[in-house]
Amino acid sequence: MQNDNKNTLMFIVSAFAILIGYQFFVLGPQQKKAEAEFRAKKAAEQQSAAKAGVTLDANGNPAPLRLSRDAAKALSPRIEVDTPALSGSIALKGARIDDLFLRKYDETTKKDSPPVELFRPEGAEHAWFADFGWAGANLPGLPDSRTVWTAAPGQVLRPNSPVTLTYDNGLGLTFTRVIAVDDQAMFTVTDSVKNNGTNGLQLAPYATVQRQGISDALGKNQIVHEGAIGVLGATDEQKLEMAKYGKWKKDKPLQSFDSVGGWTGITDKYWLAALIPGQNQAIKAQYRVTNVAGIDVYDVNFLGPVQVLNPGATVSQTTRLFAGAKTVPLLRKYEYGATPAPAIWEFWNKTKAEIPRFDDAVDWGMFRFFTRPIFNILEVFYKLVGNFGLAILLLTVVLKLVLYPMADKSYESMAKMKKIAPEVEKLKAKHKDDPAKQQQEMMALYQKEKINPMMGCLPMLIQIPVFYALYKVLTVTIEMRHAPFFGWIQDLSAPDPTTMFNLFGLIPWDPGSLPLIGAMIAHLGVWPLLYGFTMWLTTAMNPPAGDPIQQKIFQWFPVIFTFTLSGFAVGLVIYWCWSNVLTIFQQYIIMRRYKVENPIDQIIARLRGKTAGAT
C-alpha cells in the first residue's frame, strides 16, 4: 500500500514536470514563433498593400494609394451585408469585413443626409476594416489579405442567415470561415482549419482592427478619447487600456498586453470596432502604429494560443466583432448577455459580465462615478417625456430640489448681505485708513446679522460638478447626437446654429467665415443671448463685491460667458439658462421675504411707470 502511494506520488510529480517542461520548452517557443510570424506577416501585407499599384513621387518613394471608395470596393468580389442596423459587404479577397454603413445614424441632421460610414475598404483613403486568420511558424499557404476565398453564389449576410467562406491552399489545409451577425452590431466569426495532410502542425488564431490613416479632426478633441481602447489583463486584474491617436503615435507606438479574455479595438467619439475573444482564452494583445508609404497605420490586434493540428483533425476559433454605435443600453446588453444587467446603483451586485466593462467604451472620464449617474437620470427622464431637451430641464429642476436646503441658506445669506450693503459701505468709509479695524467691524456686523459671507459661493461650487458631468454626457454619448429640442434646435450636442450677426439666419451670410473673430460670433444665437441675460440678472441680484475692481470684473462676466458658452453644446446652454431662471426665482422669493431691493422689482416698477405715463 505504501509503495502504491509512493508510485502514485512519483507519477503525479513526473506528469507535472513533463507538463511544465512541454509548456516551457515546446509550446512556449512555438507560441513566440507564431507571434513573430504573425507580426512579420502583417507588416509584409501592409508594405505590399501600400505599394501595390502606386506611382512614385519625385523622390522615388511610393505615393499613398488614393482610390475612391467604389474603386477600392471593386478590387474584390463581395458578399452583401443586409441587417436592420447595418448595410455593406464582405470582401472575398482576404475574407475581410471592410464595408459597413450604420443605417440608423445619419451624417448630418439634413433630411437627405447619407448614413454614417464605419468601415472602408483598403485602398481608399482612411481605410478601416477587421481582419481574421491564422499564424504559424514557417507554414506556407496560410491565407492572407490577398487570398480570394470561395463562397456559394447568392449568399447574403443577414440575422439568422450566416455566410460560409472556404479556401483550400492546395497543401493539405482547408480553411472555413462562417460569419454570422445579429440585428444590431455584433458579428460572430468562426474560423476552422482541417488538416488533410500527414504531418502535424501548430497554428495560432489572430484578429485585427486596422485604420490606414485618419482624418485631421480625429484625436484633436481633448475631452473625448479617440484611438485604441480595451479591457485587458488577468481575469481579476483587467484594466481599461487606452491610447489616444496623437499620443499613441508619438509616445507609445507599440504596446503589448497579456490578457485572459477581455476585449480590444479602435474607437471614435461615437463609433466602435472591437474584437472580443473567448473570455477564458489567453491572448497577447497589441496596440501598434507604423508608417507605411507616408500613411500612419493604426493596428489593434490579438494573437491566441498555439493549437496543435494533427493529421485528419480540425481546430477552430470563434471571435466576435462589435461594429457600430456606442449606445449605452446596447453595450450593456452585450456586456451581460442573457443575464439581466444590474441597475447602475446596484454597486453590491456581483453579476459576472460576459464582456467585462464593455460600456466603458463610452468615455465617461475620470469622474465616471458622477458622470454616469447623470446620464442614467437623463435617460429615465427621456423615457418619461420623449425629448432629451425636456429631460435636461427636468434634471435641472430635480437637482434644484435636492440642493434646495443648502442653496436656500446660501441665498438667504446673500439677501442679508445685500440688505446691509449700505452699512458695509459706511464702515469702509469710516475705517478706510485702518484695514484691520475695518475688517474687525465688518466681521462683527456679519455676526450680529448672522451672516456667513462664504455661503454666497456655495451655489456656484455646487454647480461645477453638475456642469462638468452634463458637458461630458452631451459630448460623448451618442444618445445626445442629433437629439432635437424645439424649433431650430435639432442637435443638443452641437452649438446653437443661429447667430445675431446675420439676424438669426435672415441674412444669407456666415459670420463664422470672418478671420480671428468668426469662431466667437458664429453661434451667438438665441439661447446664448438668453443665457447672458439670465446671468446678468443673477449677478445683479447678488450683493456687490467689496472691491471696486472686482465689481467691474463681475459686471463683465455675463458678456464674457455669453461669448464663451456660445461655442458649447446648446444642451449645456439650455441647462445653464434654465438653472439661472430657477435660481432667480428662488432668490427673488427670499429677497422679498427679507424686504431687500432687487432688480426684478425695479424692472417691474419701471415698466409700470412707462405704461402709466403712456396711459
Curated annotation (Swiss-Prot):
Q: Does the keyword tRNA processing apply?
A: no
Topology relative to the membrane, per the entry?
A: Multi-pass membrane protein
Q: Which domain of life is it from?
A: Bacteria
Kindly indicate whether the keyword Zinc-finger belongs to this entry. no
One GO cellular component, as annotated: plasma membrane
SUBUNIT field: Interacts with the Sec translocase complex via SecD. Specifically interacts with transmembrane segments of nascent integral membrane proteins during membrane integration.
Similarity-based family: Belongs to the OXA1/ALB3/YidC family. Type 1 subfamily.
Q: What does this protein do?
A: Required for the insertion and/or proper folding and/or complex formation of integral membrane proteins into the membrane. Involved in integration of membrane proteins that insert both dependently and independently of the Sec translocase complex, as well as at least some lipoproteins. Aids folding of multispanning membrane proteins.
Protein name listed in UniProt:
Membrane protein insertase YidC
Q: What organism is listed for this UniProt entry?
A: Caulobacter vibrioides (strain NA1000 / CB15N)
Lineage, uppermost ranks: Bacteria, Pseudomonadati, Pseudomonadota, Alphaproteobacteria, Caulobacterales
- Gene this protein is translated from: yidC
